[in-house]
């Protein structure tokens, strides 16, 4: 991927704007997410038309993280209202976005969308890629909503247009974000085995509606198996906390393993809801209590698995923070503004939180490179260009150190808080360990 990023893709026959955007996305993914993993990419077929059917949790971030992991330009459908201005429509077409109309747009949706569908048919015939979010809208919740039939209609519509002499595959792709709205979480892309649309050609000729429904059902069940699907919406926040904050016995940082453990825990708690509803309600209620208490004392549940550290060890940990604080201050001068400026801007100007991550990632990439370029020029004026180049090379290393220092600071602060408030949360710890035996 890095070789392709720095050399190969610049020479591809893509729109220049798309190549610039691709560079930003590749850099952004590596900087914005602490860990990212793409499983099943060997399932992506080559030399054929591919329709990606993807769950939709994060507005514009969903398509760009997929586009950033593909070797060819990927088209995706977007709300038609953002195409209203001709200049904007031109720019959007240069990054391979296609308009999809809804009834609220006040147009003949069948007629207008048919143009987009015809374009998709041609893209698939020419062995291109199209991303579709069959849920129809975005929602940060890790719950699969009912699917629209657009994926099936486009796949089988392309077949019908070309007299069923076309090779089309549907790749069902699950996206999972550890944290939808903040950086340094993990990103997991999970591709299933491709669905060969030709399996449905004969039935589609005889009964189009039934075939579209059958294919859509298959997509739904496949997608559900590839994501975290919390069905209890009433207790969603508590279940999310249980899956993402309560630690596992296997404390691996591997993204795919964490995803697997979360799915297994969710299946266990869903089974408990059916077999022991009263215990299920107790655990859900306790998760609410746990979340409030942890927030109050600025703690994480993993601390409840251990007794407080000794004062000597806490002083030694704190001494390390003091010793390395000068390097942290240097890191703040070279990284704080480009890190915080996009956060301040997006949080204050963008109301829909579903767009926050994509904007923070894109703006953060631009701001970091711009800020580093400016301070390198200033540094070079005082110390010369040789040292200026060396300074620029060290900036990413300083940023990495600063991030590690901040994480270490948070952990040490948590250890101190746990030590100082242990008596206040002792009864909660006992309850937690009792429930953990059921949910671990």
Residue ranges and their predicted role:
Residues 1-2, 100, 191, 220-223:
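Intrinsic structural disorder
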Residues 11-25, 30-210, 328-440:
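Soluble catalytic domains of membrane acyltransferases
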Residues 300, 307-348:
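Core alpha-helical transmembrane segments of integral membrane proteins
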Residues 210, 217, 221-303:
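Long, charge-rich alpha-helical interaction segments
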Residues 4, 247, 258, 431-438:
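Intrinsic disorder/low-structure terminal segments
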Residues 1-16, 293-319:
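Compositionally biased, charge-rich terminal segments
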Residues 16, 87, 119, 199, ...:
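Exposed alpha-helical structural elements
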């Amino acid at each position: 991927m890095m070789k392709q990023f720095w050399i190969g893709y610049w020479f591809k026959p893509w729109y220049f704007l798309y190549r610039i955007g691709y560079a930003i996305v590749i850099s952004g993914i590596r900087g914005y997410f602490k860990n990212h993993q793409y499983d099943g990419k060997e399932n992506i077929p080559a030399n054929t038309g591919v329709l990606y059917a993807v769950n939709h949790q994060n507005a514009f971030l969903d398509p760009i993280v997929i586009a950033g992991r593909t070797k060819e330009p990927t088209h995706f459908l977007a709300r038609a209202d953002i195409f209203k201005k001709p200049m904007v429509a031109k720019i959007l077409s240069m990054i391979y976005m296609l308009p999809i109309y809804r009834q609220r747009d006040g147009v003949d949706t069948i007629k207008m969308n048919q143009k987009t569908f015809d374009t998709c048919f041609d893209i698939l015939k020419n062995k291109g890629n199209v991303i579709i979010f069959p849920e129809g809208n975005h929602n940060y919740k890790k719950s699969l909503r009912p699917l629209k039939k657009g994926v099936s209609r486009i796949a089988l519509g392309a077949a019908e247009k070309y007299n069923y002499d076309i090779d089309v595959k549907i790749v069902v792709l699950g996206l999972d974000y550890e944290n939808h709205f903040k950086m340094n979480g993990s990103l997991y892309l999970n591709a299933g085995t491709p669905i060969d649309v030709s399996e449905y050609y004969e039935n589609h000729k005889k009964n189009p509606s039934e075939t579209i429904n059958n294919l859509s059902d298959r997509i739904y069940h496949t997608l559900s198996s590839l994501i975290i699907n919390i069905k209890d919406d009433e207790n969603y926040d508590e279940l999310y906390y249980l899956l993402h904050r309560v630690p596992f016995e296997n404390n691996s940082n591997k993204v795919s393993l964490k995803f697997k453990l979360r799915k297994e825990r969710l299946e266990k708690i869903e089974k408990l809801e059916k077999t022991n509803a009263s215990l299920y309600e107790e655990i859900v209620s306790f998760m609410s209590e746990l979340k409030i208490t942890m927030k109050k004392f600025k703690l994480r549940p993993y601390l409840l698995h251990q007794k407080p550290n000794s004062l000597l060890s806490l002083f030694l940990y704190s001494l390390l923070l003091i010793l390395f604080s000068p390097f942290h201050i240097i890191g703040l001068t070279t990284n704080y503004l480009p890190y915080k400026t996009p956060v301040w801007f997006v949080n204050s100007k963008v109301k829909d939180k579903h767009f926050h991550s994509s904007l923070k990632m894109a703006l953060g990439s631009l701001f970091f490179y711009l800020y580093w370029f400016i301070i390198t020029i200033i540094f070079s004026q005082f110390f010369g260009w040789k040292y200026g180049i060396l300074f620029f090379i060290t900036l990413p290393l300083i940023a990495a150190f600063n991030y590690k220092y901040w994480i270490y600071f948070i952990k040490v602060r948590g250890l101190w808080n746990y030590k100082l408030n242990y008596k206040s949360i002792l009864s909660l710890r006992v309850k937690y360990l009792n429930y953990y035996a059921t949910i671990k």
